[in-house]
From Swiss-Prot:
This is Histone H4. It comes from Diadromus pulchellus. Keywords: Acetylation, Chromosome, DNA-binding, Methylation, Nucleosome core, Nucleus. The lineage of its organism: Eukaryota, Metazoa, Ecdysozoa, Arthropoda, Hexapoda. GO terms for molecular function: DNA binding; protein heterodimerization activity; structural constituent of chromatin. It is found in: Nucleus; Chromosome. Residues 1-20 are annotated as: Disordered. The modification N6-acetyl-N6-methyllysine is found at residues 6, 13. The keyword DNA-binding applies. It comes from the Eukaryota.
Length: 103
């Protein structure tokens, strides 16, 4: 270690990334067992095979709406970093109040 802390290479903020990983089908990262665990927590006993893709679609739309609102709050505050409070306010705006993250 050269004493620069956790931050990186020093000398400016770094250049543009030459090769950026293309994010595609991340919704498939929500696995079948994860959806099954959520359903079990909600009291579901048996799950149809068609539920998994439908659940992924619903979750994708839900998170797109939350992220869009959170980014709107961030841009309004003239910041580039989305904070936990931006997400809390976005959820509150949609009628899903979340406690435990400040505010």
């Amino acid at each position: 270690m050269t004493g620069r802390g956790k931050g990186g290479k020093g000398l400016g903020k770094g250049g543009a990334k030459r090769h950026r990983k293309v994010l595609r089908d991340n919704i498939q990262g929500i696995t079948k067992p994860a959806i099954r665990r959520l359903a079990r927590r909600g009291g579901v006993k048996r799950i149809s095979g068609l539920i998994y893709e439908e659940t992924r679609g619903v979750l994708k739309v839900f998170w797109q709406n939350v992220i869009r609102d959170a980014v709107t709050y961030t841009e309004h505050a003239k910041r580039k970093t989305v904070t936990a409070m931006d997400v809390v306010y976005a959820l509150k705006r949609q009628g899903r109040t979340l406690y435990g993250f400040g505010g």
